[in-house]
C-alpha cells in the first residue's frame, strides 16, 4: 500500500509533519478540523510538501525522521534546497 509523508503550514506559522495512505482524504480531514489535535487548533492549514512511498511504513519512518529536524532544515527540504540539508544537519558543539 502506498504511503505519503507531508508537511503542512498551520495558521500559527508552525509546521506539522504527518503520514497517510490517502493524501487527498487526510488533507481534507485536516482542513475540516478532523485531523490531528494540533492542526485542529491551528486552522487553516496549507500543504507545502509531500513525498510518495511504495509502502506506508516507509512514509511513517520518514515522518519521524523529519519531525526531529530543525525549522531551517525543513524549510530547505520544502524549498527544494536539498544540497543544504547536510550542512543544516551538522551541530556546532564548539559554541
Model-derived regions, located:
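GIY-YIG nuclease catalytic motif and its immediate N-terminal context
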Residues: 1-36, 40-52, 60-64, 82-95
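C2H2-type zinc-finger recognition helix
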Residues: 56
Amino acid at each position: 500500500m502506498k504511503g505519503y509523508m507531508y508537511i503542512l503550514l498551520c495558521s500559527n506559522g508552525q509546521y506539522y509533519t504527518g503520514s497517510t495512505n490517502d493524501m487527498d482524504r487526510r488533507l481534507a480531514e485536516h482542513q475540516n478540523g478532523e485531523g490531528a489535535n494540533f492542526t485542529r487548533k491551528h486552522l487553516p492549514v496549507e500543504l507545502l510538501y509531500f513525498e510518495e512511498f511504495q509502502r506506508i511504513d516507509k512514509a511513517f519512518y520518514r515522518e519521524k525522521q523529519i519531525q526531529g529536524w530543525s525549522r531551517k532544515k525543513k524549510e530547505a527540504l520544502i524549498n527544494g534546497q536539498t544540497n543544504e540539508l547536510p550542512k543544516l544537519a551538522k551541530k556546532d558543539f564548539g559554541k
